[in-house]
Amino acid sequence: MIVELCYEPFEHILIKESYDHNQLNNVHNELDTLFPLLKGPQYTMSAEEKDGQYKKKNKGIFLDYEMQPYCDIGKESVIVQYRNFFFDVIVNNYKYEKSNYELKSLVSYYGDGDRYRSHVDHAIYTMVTFLCKDNAKFSGGQLFFPEYNWSIDPIDNVTIIFPSSTYHEVLPVKSSEDLNRYGIFTITYIFTI
């Protein structure tokens, strides 16, 4: 895990090699298992336009409560298990007390034509990890921060942590064909009080 505290164009934390080799394999395997369980935006707390239309077009699942029926008894999602490593990065860099926060874990998948229009999250910090099996199979999908005209590419195993009140969007994904599981997976951890 390579952690970099960045101040430009806004304060954020960038993590490269977010997972070690074994963890990354475990996460990709879990994503393969989760893929058929993913649901539309009406089930993943999507932000909405003024007319009530969802701002996102993708699929996802909250791991904290929706996945439990699919897990072996006593077995927790590896993605949920690993989130504590990331939580420690926030606690160590911003001097927060762990016990004051609740974490929610959302897995999302962006295939051909999918996007998430500009929005803020109702939380303190948002953390997004990109997981892509083959970046050559798609284009687009950058996490864009319109107030700063700045974006981060969806590179496998890279994480960004930023204040949830910062407007952000996922730019449209383009693919010659919607190859299942070869678009962009994101794991979003939302830190709330």
Task: Please place each PLM-identified region on the residue numbering.
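Non-heme Fe(II)/2-oxoglutarate
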Residues: M1-Y94
